[in-house]
Amino acid sequence: MGVMLDTIGQLIAGYLQKEVPGYEPFTPSDPEHLRGVVEPGDVLLVEGNNRISGIIKYLTQSTWSHAALYVGPIDGAAEPDGEPHVLIEANIGEGVTSAPLSKYFPYHTRLCRPVGLSYEDRTTVCRYAINRIGFGYDTKNIVDLARYLVPLPVPQRWRRRMIAFGSGDPTKIICSALIAQAFDAVRYPILPKITRAASRKARREILHIRDSSLYMPRDFDISPYFEIVKPTIVHGFDYLSLHW
């Protein structure tokens, strides 16, 4: 039975990862500018072009379907041409893997940077993610995979739960959950729940960490604690020098 479930799961995962033909990014990345500004601890959001990307974008009502963490060159991980792997990501059917930055040059991307995070904590965040390379996605969990095959539409109040449904095993991680857990390791907020102390003498906001499995790629975009870094203007921009 286990072999059969695993086979069915792999077939579903393969179907979900197939690219949708005709994808053209509205605003493609500028590779050289991106490579020149990205720093360890930055979160790279991606507008994907496979079947699961379209479903995630619908469920999250967002442009972004995937997130990867930039950690800098990883020892022993490189492309055949020598380009180092610098990203950690979790993909359905693959689990937690590393990748070169060039993987996402053809895509529409956004760079999100944690504000005020110390060098030591950045290092901890990156090391947390690197140590999880090899964590898998359990293709035997058909229910977990089938959530992406549910006919649309899905009521709005269920959409975030649809992303997290079936999760629970700490070694089976989706992309945004992996990154959320890495920042949780240093208690850096993304989109915490906020409550207010009842006492008048203690009027202050109290932040509560959300379940990491409920995070979506777009949460890094809308988080008040992450800066949006636009590579083409970060070092200055002269609109008069443009020819258009």
Labelled PLM ranges:
Residues 1-244:
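Cysteine-nucleophile amide-bond enzymes
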